[in-house]
């Protein structure tokens, strides 16, 4: 082939640059230009349906790509002095060697370390085990696949971050329309409008706010057994759903957290064998404007839930059929907040706690036709001034002049007139 001064490829065909050959000044608008080991392409401009593929051992220099043009760099291939413009896509792993610039700045991949790439329009980077990527931007249809470690990733609308088992991510930001799928480990993630699905991985210090959704233990199709989140913060506009696995420690301020029932919810999902139950442990604080809804059957005995003024805790037993419903919790502190106990048509409701203390209200919702004096009782240590309100299914008040009176033995309380 030799060295060409000017080439135009727009016919959709495939052209190969073989060992020892050099092609220069190519305008690639349709079709593929493949640079094999020992081959070299210089000053290639890739747009439209054009695709420049640099195979292992091949070299590309001064490549420009944009407007739907694609550059693929295989493991062991080299592409230097790249210029990426709007609409371009690059596909590679951390075994490639590249450097260049795009509208957001400069980027490089060398010796297993990637920094600064802009991945969009189907572009993707595969971070291999033992390798690292930092400051990656994911936009429309851009993907980052992590078996190694990554940090400071920004996922914008249409972008997707995937962290596989053994992979780790830290200090990532998921904006509106962005997606984070986690099966490895993550820390200090900010969900600022996007979605995060923990698929049996572990995350810590995740912040959920501004219309974003966090899901633990599911991708919407299957439940995953070993998922865990620690020190979760759910702020105004944020929503967290626990479908399977463990939530340990949370602060909820203006957001909503839902622990789904492990027995009746998710019945349309494929369930992993020996999947973990839905479990809440550690310290949970519900601040002003916060709500937590817990499905019946979730494991709560190792939790301490504090409900501040303006916060609402809902224990939902509406799926339980029959006359009796028992709610089992660790510790509940009512600091001016409300505890709702939701039942179907139960005539006897029991709340089992280690400790129930503070000042606040318990609101019991039922469609039962009759309310007896022993309609509700509490087993466990009870202290403070706790009033009780009973409503029907539409939350119309049936009786509100009631309070919990601690038993003389100090290990329970019963319903008494206020």
Curated annotation (Swiss-Prot):
InterPro entries: AIDA, Autotransporter_pectin_lyase_C, Pectin_lyase_fold/virulence, Pertactin_central
Source organism, top-level taxon: Bacteria
GO biological process, one term: DNA damage response
Changes seen on gene knockout: No change in cell adhesion or biofilm formation. Increased biofilm formation.
Name used for this protein in its record: Protein YdhQ
Organism field: Escherichia coli (strain K12)
Organism classification: Bacteria, Pseudomonadati, Pseudomonadota, Gammaproteobacteria, Enterobacterales
